[in-house]
């Protein structure tokens, strides 16, 4: 079994507030290309954390690819309360994350800040690599996960950056 964590920018972090934004289709094209590459190299599990934005779009692409490839999808939420306060539109997205092959909640609810690092350590230990939409020019809290991932020997990171997206949009 080979598992890849998929995570990246949330929609609000990159200023995308509408699913019909033309940037979403470019991002999804890149996701499709990269996920097919993973599948053709033997990856059989895609792991998500249940966030809106990049993960949401990658989940949509992964579900489409299930028709062509034998793959499994998991969502490992940080807390059982993840998304409880989301609006109705976002609740529909949350239900898609819960309708995958495997769902786990790492903690019942928030108690202390160390839960975040414990969660990321668990994700790193349970996956062989990560596909991350992230650019050092636009830092978020993902920088802490990436630092841990880069410190792990043999952990494979594939970054989708703004430069890669620009190259794709021009070709």
From Swiss-Prot:
It holds the Pfam family YpsA. InterPro entries: YspA. Belongs to the UPF0398 family. This is UPF0398 protein MGAS2096_Spy1375.
